[in-house]
Amino acid sequence: MWSFLLPDARRRRDRALGLAGVLRSALLVQDIARNGAQPGDLLQTCIRSVLALDSKDSLRALGDIDSLRHSLALLCPLLQRGPGNAREAELLRYSMALTTLGKRLLKNASATRRVQEGVEQAQRQIAHFADPMQRSIVAGLAQTYTEAIGILRPRIIVSGESRFLSDPDDAARIRTLLLSGIRAAVLWRQAGGRLPATILERRALCQEAEELLATHPQLTR
């Protein structure tokens, strides 16, 4: 499940992409929980990243640079100076929890099997409906998160407005996005990502993020 080997030359780039993918999910979760936002195309990109079981390319698995632009731009400030306000502190909390859960998922065979079963079921549904945003597909992936990731620790407590957190559709979107964040965390870990090393190589990761943004200017929204 979600497993492939990466050439050494791509490992640092893929670590930057993986962290940006984690942060993208955290940003979208926060926006739904606080504002009831409807992420639309970004949610669809995140769903497709969950379904990319055998992609050999991290960027293709995560979507494209445009979908990661905001998180790539935010990655450097968070790595270099830490969170500058309560919103960024919350994003960092979500992101660190997602990276930890990615590690623990890979070590838990039953949770890994449950994720694979849920992803394969969603793939079959998409083959029928052709739309990854179909309500039943989002609900199914959310259920996969609950059943597979809910047994792991730490538990992610999402903060926000109760009217959004209690809405079944918003709650399903949030859980699906958390699953996509764990998928990005798995990519990061497969590229050699480790939290202590991230602090030591933060300057190099920032350089990778800046180069990715600079080489894809045409994708700006």
Curated annotation (Swiss-Prot):
Coiled coil: none annotated. It comes from the Bacteria. Signal peptide: none annotated. It holds the Pfam family DUF489. Transmembrane segments: none annotated. Disulfide bonds: none annotated. It is a peripheral membrane protein. This is High frequency lysogenization protein HflD homolog. It comes from Acidithiobacillus ferrooxidans (strain ATCC 23270 / DSM 14882 / CIP 104768 / NCIMB 8455).
